[in-house]
Amino acid sequence: LIINPLRPLWELNLSGKVFAAAAHTGLTEMANGINQMRLDTEHEYFNSGVMLIDLNAARNLVTAEDVFRCVSEHERELILPDQDVFNILYGSKTMPVEDVIWNYDVRNYSKYLIRSTGKHDLNWVMRNTAVLHFCGRNKPWQADYKNLFGMLYLHYQNLTMRKLHEKSKQERAVQ
């Protein structure tokens, strides 16, 4: 869910990197270490939910053959296949961006709050975060969704439905 402008990400200088993405480090960054060992990498483990891509550079770098070879060679280690393959092949060509701004995992509100010593509260998130990522199995469009950010999703869904309804009425009036 996009709640603030993406332009600063769009205008980011990649400084020679091909991609920019956020790593969901959690409270202790333990997952990074586990993923580095599991995938034999030395960089942060990047989430593939939101990425900035230098398309010209990526077209020269990314090949289907490399992706299929990676899947074949690492099929036993792949837990989140898209992210795992991305990290194995292109993680070293990725610029880290702040997950709290560009790929906020809504399941981890408490962790963000603790990690920031209380700074990244709900008001801060609403003013500063650009992308809320509804990671995991449970989604805000499901009736039993219980996350704090679910109401925000429903609010934007309601606004969208109103706009679509108004547009439809205007189009019918013109005909």
Language model: regions and residue ranges:
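GT-A fold catalytic core of metal-dependent nucleotide-sugar glycosyltransferases
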Residues: 1-29, 50-53
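A short secondary-structure junction signal
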Residues: 3-8, 30-35, 61-66, 144
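Short secondary-structure boundary/capping segments
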Residues: 10-11, 42-43, 122-123
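A short, conserved beta-to-alpha structural element at the edge of catalytic cores
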Residues: 15-39, 146-152
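Short, P/G- and charge-enriched loop/turn segments at secondary-structure junctions
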Residues: 35-41, 116-121
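A glycosyltransferase accessory/donor-loop signature
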Residues: 47-175
